[in-house]
């Protein structure tokens, strides 16, 4: 139909309206599609960096503000609830679009990280401002995966969702790298504040990039399933007759099912060990295993770096084989093995040994998560491709729902002080249990177990697409 090599953006109604009217006129192809995906991924990285900026030096903030582990855990719980509310609001992205949510969220996070949080006078102000950061993050947590789904057909979805997960993963990788390079061995609150400022500068730069360049598909195009890029002409033709109001009617009734709600909760149960690594390894490794803060950030760099590579590799493999579920099972098994190794690590364990254990954990989490997210978006499309943001908000809300109870109970299980060996051992057994609970829900997801079955279904679908495209060409020639 058309090759989208320039910025194919509808700009009717004024020279500046393109800053908020972001609909493309055609499905993007080639380098421009890759560029749009890259912008979304970079935005997601910066979002994670701003929200987690202080995590690399959390032990310093506790004495500065007079916070306890219990207060910190409760803060994460409240912030998670706030993010969950934002997820619900952003579910309207099916009608309003997703791109402006990302742009506005970057501006909010940039201003708060650069100015507000570093100047927080007390722990209450710090907690309030952190919750506001999570409010913006909750909206973006829905908007960015929806955009990645929009720009990636199903045959490239595993790789695309692996790249989307770069946001949470690469955000922490950047944070660890900056912290290890910038923070001295004796960390003070003054240099800790700059971790937020660095992320704030990055967020404002990314805000300008997204304001100028980020675009999205019009509702008619994004509300359809597309298995491969060669279907884009057919999708654009069908979009002309699509009734969006009818397609999005009774949206919650359409999207709330076992394989959307229960699987969203189940994957977050699987990720309890991931949430533990994000929020509490900063205590566990330095205080229990006696690593310095610098060594901890070095191990974290390796952990997140391995995760980045693994997400792309596992996502690409699941695309190539056209199956997701076997990877989820393999990743679950590897995660259990890694937790057992971590549980049996003792004080004095070497840097290399701990890096290897966490690399196994990181690889296993990626093996399950990237294919799961690809399968989840395909499951949503099987329900109604016009309600991807609504379905994504279920996942975003489930992330917070699972985080609330676990955030409340972990301080009581690991004990205070944090160096309680029996408490951490109990917690790791709970993490193993949550992985086991996840496994049965793999069977509820959309998709096949055997590559041969998936390949046959795709070939049949391609034959139907070719037939429809041939009919369209004949009708066009006759006209």
Task: Give the label of every model feature segment.
Residues 54-58, 258-311, 369, 373, ...:
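Extracytoplasmic gate region of multi-pass secondary transporters
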Residues 76-91, 301-314:
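Central cavity-lining transmembrane alpha-helices of secondary-active solute carriers
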Residues 84-122:
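Conserved MFS/SLC helix-loop-helix module at the cytosolic interface between two early adjacent transmembrane helices
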Residues 95-106, 319-333:
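Cytoplasmic membrane-interface "Motif A"-like loop-to-helix N-cap segments
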Residues 107-121, 333-348:
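C-terminal ends and interior cores of transmembrane alpha-helices
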Residues 129-167:
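Cytoplasmic helix-loop-helix junction between adjacent transmembrane helices
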Residues 164-219:
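Helix-loop-helix hairpin linking two adjacent transmembrane segments in secondary transporters
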Residues 382-418:
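A late C-terminal transmembrane helix in Major Facilitator Superfamily
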């Amino acid at each position: 139909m058309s090759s989208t090599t320039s910025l194919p953006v509808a700009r009717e109604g004024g020279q500046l309206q393109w800053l908020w009217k972001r609909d493309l006129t055609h499905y993007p192809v080639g380098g421009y599609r890759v560029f749009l995906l890259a912008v979304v991924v970079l935005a997601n990285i910066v979002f994670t960096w701003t929200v987690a900026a202080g995590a690399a030096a959390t032990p310093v903030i506790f004495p500065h503000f007079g916070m306890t582990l219990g207060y910190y855990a409760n803060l994460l719980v409240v912030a998670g609830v706030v993010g969950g509310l934002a997820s619900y609001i952003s579910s309207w992205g099916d009608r309003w679009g997703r791109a402006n949510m990302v742009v506005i969220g970057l501006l909010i996070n940039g201003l708060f990280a650069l100015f507000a949080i570093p100047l927080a006078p007390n722990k209450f102000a710090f907690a309030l401002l952190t919750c506001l950061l999570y409010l913006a993050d909750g909206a973006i947590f829905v908007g960015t995966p929806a955009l990645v789904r929009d720009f990636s057909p199903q045959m490239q979805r595993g790789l695309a969702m692996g790249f989307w997960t770069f946001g949470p993963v690469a955000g922490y990788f950047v944070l660890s790298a900056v912290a290890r390079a910038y923070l001295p061995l004796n960390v003070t609150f003054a240099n800790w504040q700059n971790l937020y400022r660095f992320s704030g500068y990055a967020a404002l730069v990314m805000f300008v990039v997204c304001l100028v360049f980020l675009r999205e598909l019009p509702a008619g195009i994004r509300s359809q399933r597309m298995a491969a890029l060669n279907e884009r002409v057919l999708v654009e033709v069908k979009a002309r007759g699509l009734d969006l109001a009818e397609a999005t009617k009774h949206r919650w009734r359409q999207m709330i099912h076992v394989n959307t709600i229960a699987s969203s909760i189940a994957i977050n149960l699987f990720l309890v060990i991931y949430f533990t690594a994000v929020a509490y390894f900063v205590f566990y490794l330095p205080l229990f295993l006696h690593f310095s803060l610098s060594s901890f950030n070095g191990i974290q760099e390796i952990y997140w770096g391995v995760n980045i590579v693994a997400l792309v590799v596992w996502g690409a493999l699941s695309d190539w084989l056209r199956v997701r579920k076997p990877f989820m099972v393999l990743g679950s098994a590897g995660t259990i093995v890694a937790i057992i190794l971590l549980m049996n690590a003792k004080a004095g364990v070497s840097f290399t040994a701990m890096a290897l254990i966490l690399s196994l954990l990181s690889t296993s989490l990626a093996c399950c998560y990237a294919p799961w997210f690809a399968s989840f978006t395909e499951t949503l499309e099987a329900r109604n491709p016009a309600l991807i943001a609504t379905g994504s908000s279920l996942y975003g809300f489930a992330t917070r729902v699972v985080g609330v109870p676990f955030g409340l109970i972990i301080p009581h299980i690991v004990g205070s002080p944090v160096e309680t060996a029996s408490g951490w051992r109990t917690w790791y057994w709970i993490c193993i249990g949550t992985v086991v609970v996840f496994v049965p829900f793999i069977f509820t997801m959309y998709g096949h177990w055997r590559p041969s079955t998936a390949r046959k279904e795709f070939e049949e679908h391609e034959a139907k697409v070719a037939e429809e495209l041939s009919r369209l060409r004949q009708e066009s020639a006759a006209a």
